[in-house]
Structure formats: structure tokens, C-alpha cells
From Swiss-Prot:
InterPro entries cross-referenced by the UniProt entry: G_ENGB_dom, GTP-bd, GTP-bd_ribosome_bio_YsxC, P-loop_NTPase
Protein name according to UniProt: Probable GTP-binding protein EngB
Annotated function: Necessary for normal cell division and for the maintenance of normal septation.
Residues the entry annotates as binding GTP: 38-45, 64-68, 82-85, 149-152, 182-185
Positions of Mg(2+) binding: 45, 66
Length: 211
């Protein structure tokens, strides 16, 4: 019998908790948090919605509309965090700087943050923002897992080639501390692999079914 990933049930019951404009508005710093980051229009909201089987994260044709830290509760001790998207040209510079300042404060001070999921559009991977996040994760000893989103936009062969290319680049620059996979929200590609990472970071273990 196939084992059911223990994080699946928690993700399916995810509920919106609150939005925070700055760190002191965040929930109590305890338990387990996994944050989702990505350049604007990298498919972050769609990935979050697919992982939770709900429309929790706001999606929009205008990238960068998520301007706050959005917290979603899985249970009393575990949360997912949707971080602000970055890099959209139409967002005013002062607002970009505001986002950056509070994102850095959150990432640098949050004791309950156990890992960072970084979204990269498979057609445009390793942007300047992505490199900054990689540098921060390694310097902070923060576990990072990359989703190469929108993998359905390429043929399977092209997607695999891009995955191998990015894997090689990351190993050369950042070592083996960062894991990476293909992901597609519309095709539901890569869900089980992503769930396994979440379960590990949130200290949930697969359990054999009762006989």
C-alpha cells in the first residue's frame, strides 16, 4: 500500500491567518514555518494554491500585488508564509524598498523559519533576485528547495535539460545544500516531491498504515 505523505492532510486544511506589513505583526515566533519566495510572476501564488488544494494565495495578471507577509496555518504549530514578490517594473521604487527592508527583517530574525521554497520560472531561472536569495540561504544555513515553475511551458526534454543546467550552476556556486525540482501547477507536476520536503522541514514523518 502506498504511504500517504503526512503533510498532505495538513496542507489541505490550510487556513489564512493574517497579513503582516512588518515583523512585529507576525504570529508568535514558535513552531515551524516554511516561507515561499520568488520573483514577481514566477508562479508563487499558483504553486501555493496547488499545494494547499485551495485558493489561499492571491493570483493576479498584475505581478507584485502581494505586498505583505501572508501567513497560512496548517495546525497549531505549523505555518506556510507567502513572501512579497519582487522585480516588477510597475511597482514604485519606494514600495520595492519597503518590501525589501521588511523581508530582510523577517528572514534575518525568524527563529521558527525552518526552510525557504524559492520559485524560479523555468524559462527565466537564476535572476539577480534568485542569486541574492541563494546567497542569503547559504550564509544563514537556511535549508532551501527550488521549484522550477511553469515546467509545462517547455517540452519534457527541454525542462529536464534546464533542470540539469541549473543544478550544475547551483552546485558550482553554492554546493549541495540546495535541492531543486521541476514543478507545474496546472499539470500538478512535482507535488509529491514538494510535499516530502515540507514534511521533512516540519518534522513530520511518514507512518505505515495500521494493519
Amino acid at each position: 500500500m502506498q504511504l500517504k505523505n503526512p503533510i498532505l492532510g495538513l496542507c489541505q486544511q490550510a487556513t489564512f491567518m493574517l497579513s503582516a506589513a512588518k515583523v512585529d505583526q507576525c504570529p508568535d515566533d514558535e513552531g515551524f514555518e516554511v516561507a515561499f519566495a520568488g520573483r514577481s510572476n514566477a508562479g508563487k501564488s499558483s504553486a501555493l494554491n496547488t499545494l494547499t488544494h485551495a485558493s489561499l494565495a492571491r493570483t493576479s495578471k498584475t505581478p507584485g500585488r502581494t505586498q505583505l507577509l501572508n501567513f497560512f496555518g496548517l495546525d497549531e504549530d505549523r505555518r506556510l508564509v507567502d513572501l512579497p514578490g519582487y522585480g516588477y517594473a510597475k511597482v514604485p521604487i519606494p514600495l520595492k524598498l519597503h518590501w525589501q527592508r521588511h523581508l530582510e527583517a523577517y528572514l534575518g530574525s525568524r527563529e521558527s523559519l525552518k526552510g525557504l521554497i524559492l520559485m524560479m520560472d523555468i524559462r527565466h531561472p537564476m535572476t539577480d533576485f534568485d542569486l541574492l536569495m541563494l546567497d542569503w540561504a547559504i550564509a544563514s544555513n537556511m535549508p532551501m528547495h527550488i521549484l522550477l515553475t511553469k515546467a509545462d511551458k517547455l517540452t519534457y526534454g527541454a525542462a529536464k535539460n534546464t533542470l540539469l543546467k541549473v543544478q550544475t550552476e547551483i552546485r558550482k556556486g553554492w554546493g549541495d545544500a540546495v535541492s531543486i525540482q521541476l514543478f507545474s501547477a496546472p499539470k500538478r507536476m512535482g507535488l509529491e516531491e514538494a510535499y516530502t520536503v515540507l514534511a521533512d522541514w516540519m518534522e513530520l514523518e511518514d507512518k505505515a498504515p495500521a494493519e
